[in-house]
Amino acid sequence: MAVRIDGSYGEGGGQILRTSIALSALLGKPVEIVNIRAKRANPGLQPQHLTGVSAAALLTDAEVEGAAKGSTRLFFKPKALKCGTFNIDIGTAGSISLVVQTLAPILLYAPCPTKLVITGGTDVAWAPPIDYMRFVFARYLTRFGARIAIELVKRGHYPRGGGKAVVQAEPAGRLRAVDSVEFGRPAKIAGVSHAVNLPPHVAERQARAAREALAKLGYAAEVEVEARNDGLGPGSGVVLWAESDVGNVVGGDALGERGKPAEEVGREAAEKLAAVLKAGASLDPHMADMVVLYMALAQGRSRLSTTEATMHLQTNIYIVEQFLPVKFKLERAGPRYIIEVEGVGYP
């Protein structure tokens, strides 16, 4: 019997699809998703969603119905988890990070190590930048006992893409719960400021503005400057992260765009990171919505905190609860929200 998911629930976007496909694939449960992106101006599946679906189908030898542009219904029936090396081309500047979000949980339950070579957009709007996935997402998952490495080969920006990343993961066995409501003391604050096919001073100005904004708040940051000329088009951005003495890692990011001063990009990333540090949360808003799936799969009770109960977070909790016999608690506690669940200890 397929799990039936209403794709218009809550946030009503691609996140529902990504989480549903990931859980269907790794649990071996068929899923039917209806009303996909029904509330959006361009409803139904878009090319970058289709890449995630086809990649998940490749990794699970799945039977798929409705995988076409504009389709508002998708049926996905996985067979067996596969492993090895796979090449995935999103085409244009579809987000590599969003495809990684879909596939990472599947890789952790594959029968042997897996390598994905993914081409597309590394730093694009409405998605976590690739440096966030490398330095926050992948590192946070080690707390659950997962081993996943993301290597940046080449950056790709909107509209032409052409970026490349390599993802390598090992089977995790059973994930362990993480109980860490307090961020702890910042042990290291670092970042990457990049500019591609732009004057090198763009990356330098972004980095300086980020460092100065954090310094005013009492935080010393080391921000690497990366100026490259190997992209298909221009683009820039900043990702900052803070690691704590108890093993937490949180991030803040901003993307450059035409007409937006480099200093504004740096300050925006710094302000996002500072807001999480000020609240003492163990998760930033990006990571909070991505982590609930791993909390539910882990063995034991996980308790983490974040600064916002975003619609993405609430929607992901709803999706996970449709697939697994878990019940999340999401409660306000001062400047933070506490996310708590007793995981199932899969498999």
From Swiss-Prot:
Alphabetized GO MF terms: ATP binding; RNA-3'-phosphate cyclase activity
SUPFAM superfamilies named in the record: EPT/RTPC-like, RNA 3'-terminal phosphate cyclase, RPTC, insert domain
Main location: cytoplasm
Residues annotated as the enzyme's active site: H312 (tele-amp-histidine intermediate)
Keyword Repeat tagged: no
Gene3D superfamilies assigned: RNA 3'-terminal phosphate cyclase domain, RNA 3'-terminal phosphate cyclase, insert domain
Keyword terms, alphabetized: ATP-binding, Cytoplasm, Ligase, Nucleotide-binding
HAMAP family in the cross-refs: RTC
Record-given protein name: RNA 3'-terminal phosphate cyclase
The organism of origin for this protein: Pyrobaculum neutrophilum (strain DSM 2338 / JCM 9278 / NBRC 100436 / V24Sta)
Gene this protein is translated from: rtcA
